[in-house]
Regions:
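Bacterial extracytoplasmic/cell-wall-associated proteins, especially those involved in peptidoglycan
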Residues: 26-27, 40-240
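Acidic helix-start/capping segments at beta-turn-to-alpha-helix junctions
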Residues: 10-14, 34-40
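Short, well-structured active-site flanking segments
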Residues: 26-36
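Glycine-rich loop/hinge motif
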Residues: 1-26, 96-104
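DNA-binding alpha-helical recognition surfaces that contact promoter or target DNA
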Residues: 19, 34, 229
């Protein structure tokens, strides 16, 4: 039996992962997506909210790592191996999640946004605090307004949904410029640093942040006025 080693990085979505498995001749992308999003009898699956609005029910529940697979294996075997690794990692943070006042799905959803929004792991606890502060004050900040969710709609939902009605439904559930609070589910598969950032965020009174895409520097703001100045500093807007 021939084996192959495949590395998955933090922030990949299930579509990326499925393609990578197919490219490495482990199993087909379609078989993987079907099998991975089904219940496999693992305890933690009972803690995943099935709110009916998640595009892929198990998006976010894949632990990014390097795995050894058999070439031409079944998607069922592959999924089982991946679930075992996720369950191991989940056990290490399960108590923290219970104490956080958030559900597992909320933690993983926010961690997936932090994974894609933060310029570096060091910034993750502060970036998490911005989103948590906004979630804590829904009257003032009803929406998270994260571009990462619109990218997920463009790259995953619009390419994989069956029909227009389905695209419209999921867009409403995932677009953080339209929906209140968190999207319906995770938008990528975050690593441990992002999960821990959500569970142990920095205490701040920031409600905005932006990244200078060239330098990777992050600017935080308490008010919209400060944020608008930061956008200029970060090279994302012209001075008014």
């Amino acid at each position: 039996y021939k084996t192959v080693s495949v590395t998955f990085t933090e922030g990949e979505n299930l579509l990326d992962i499925a393609k990578k498995l197919e490219d490495n001749e482990v199993c087909t992308a379609d078989d993987f997506l079907f099998e991975f999003n089904k219940n496999q009898g693992f305890d933690f699956e009972n803690d995943v909210d099935d709110n009916g609005d998640m595009f892929y029910r198990m998006e976010g529940y894949f632990y990014p790592d390097t795995y050894e697979f058999y070439v031409n294996d079944s998607a069922g075997n592959v999924t089982k191996k991946l679930r075992e690794q996720f369950e191991k990692k989940y056990e290490t943070v399960k108590a923290k999640i219970k104490n956080s006042g958030m559900s597992l799905n909320e933690v993983m959803t926010l961690a997936s946004i932090v994974q894609l929004e933060a310029a570096s792991e060091d910034e993750m606890p502060k970036v998490a605090s911005v989103f948590l502060n906004r979630l804590d004050d829904p009257d003032t900040y009803p929406m998270l307004q994260s571009d990462t969710t619109t990218n997920y709609i463009k790259n995953v939902i619009k390419t994989e949904a069956d029909n227009t009605a389905s695209i419209e439904h999921y867009t409403e559930c995932y677009d953080t410029y339209k929906c209140k609070g968190l999207p319906a589910g995770p938008i990528c598969n975050p690593g441990m640093a992002a999960i821990n950032a959500v569970l142990e965020p920095k205490k701040t009174d920031y409600y905005y942040f932006c990244n200078n895409l060239k330098t990777g520097e992050t600017f935080y703001a308490k008010t919209l006025d400060e944020h608008e100045e930061n956008l200029v500093k970060a090279g994302l807007a012209k001075k008014k």
